[in-house]
Amino acid sequence: MSSSASAGKMGTPQITFFCICAVIVLGTLTASASLGPAGLTLWAIAIVLFVIPNMMIISELGTTYPAEGGIYDWIRRAFGKRMSTRAIYLYWVSNGIWMAANFILLTGVIADTFWPGMPLWVQLPLVIGFIWLTVAIINHQVEIGIGITVTGALFKIIIIGTAGIGGMVYAFHHGIATPFTAESLIPSSSSSGIGFFSAIIYNITGFELVACMGSVLKNPARTMPRAILYSSLAVVGLYIFGSLGIMMALPLDHINLVSGVTDAIRPLFGDNSPIVLIITVLFMLCIVGDQVTWSMAPSRAAAEAAREGCLPAIVGKWHPKYNTPCGASTTLGWVGTAVSILYTCFAAGDNADAFWSAFSFSSTCIISSYLLFYPAFIKLRLSDPGTSRPYRMPGGAVTAWVCTLLCVSFIAVAIVLFVFPDILSGTVNWRHSGPIVIGMIFILAVGEVIIRRSEQRHAATLTASLQETPQ
């Protein structure tokens, strides 16, 4: 479903900022920095072997098949309705889990700033409150959501710029907190935090989100490739710059997953500095912006699937006044609320553990859908060669196959490291991995039941409608 009233509201600048807001996740910037100098080498590898292929694949699909459903539409064209519904179900419902992770992070920052030692039972109502604030924003008119994503992108640039510059200034006066040597730049399975490499891969996914906003894009054939190029360059540059700043200001064993960004600027400006407080508040607002972006676009794709009878009808409900996917976004709110309660219990009093567990779980679900998304690209190249492609990946079939295999390989590695972050060192922490494995099995099983029942109900409705039609 689309809105003609809202058509053409996002040009190249808005699409660029939307992608920046969607892709840059401040909470995972610290995970990237936790890799130490070896993370810079991993970033270089990821840029060449994942970012560039990913950028070209999304540009070709987004300009060839511009539609409200985004990856749902692409996978449906390639592999059929049921497979596309499985993918978009994971893509969509996992954002309810990510919503919980995001706001666990937000309340952790609030606690660190205003109430150190705030117990989790106090943080939980705040998490739930932020979840339903996000749902209310998404259910309102689309211009508000777009405005929040643009503002969030600007705030992220300010925050990462401040952390990067602040860390470098601190290092100039006091020395570099994290030693940089030739040996430290070489990744190894024994490197501290090597499991966080999955966060680097996740950090550079999400550019395809904007394709779910098909009805509000201005001339996507022209604007989307430009915006994806600009935003890809900005995202990679900001992540590397911010990671460098954090490493220069903090030793690796002092980088906190929840408060690492604000911790990096405290040594320069002081704990009680107004600048630290301003950056902290901007950080909080960015987290809300993250969730609006990551919930708004997939909810549209899920609503499109529900419209075709592949998900429950309630998911396909659109707001009668604002034409927003209120059914899908409200469902995400309930998922996020349930997950917040569960993961607060699992955290056993540690906010950082709660964030990383929920983040790993949601990220595994989200990027699992990419295992169908990338093959859909090569399948459509083979099965639909006659469709005009305003942007076509250069290099012919060989390049298309190589890029697809590279992207699938990186996603597979990220999934393994999210679930088993210590596997490269030969150990498995089942306290971390167990809930993710069980959760994935549960979500996949529930999804299969929901999809098949939705298909049966839709078929029954169509049959009844045909029987009632006068011959």
Question: Residues of each region from the PLM?
Answer:
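C-terminal membrane-solvent junction of multi-pass transporters and transport-like membrane proteins
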Residues: 6, 151, 314-323, 367-420
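Membrane-interface loop-to-helix entry segments
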Residues: 122-174, 205, 228-233, 359, ...
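Helix-loop-helix junctions that connect adjacent transmembrane segments
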Residues: 6, 40-41, 117-118, 122, ...
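Helix-loop-helix connectors at the membrane interface of multi-pass transporters/channels
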Residues: 1-4, 72-82, 103-126, 159, ...
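TM-loop-TM module centered on a large, flexible mid-protein loop between adjacent transmembrane helices
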Residues: 73-74, 80, 112-116, 227-292, ...
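Hydrophobic transmembrane alpha-helices that form the core helical bundles
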Residues: 34, 53-131, 136-139, 284-301, ...
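A generic transmembrane alpha-helix motif of multi-pass inner-membrane proteins
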Residues: 357, 361-369, 395-471
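Membrane-interface "cap" regions at the ends of multi-pass membrane proteins
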Residues: 1-58, 67-68, 181, 386, ...
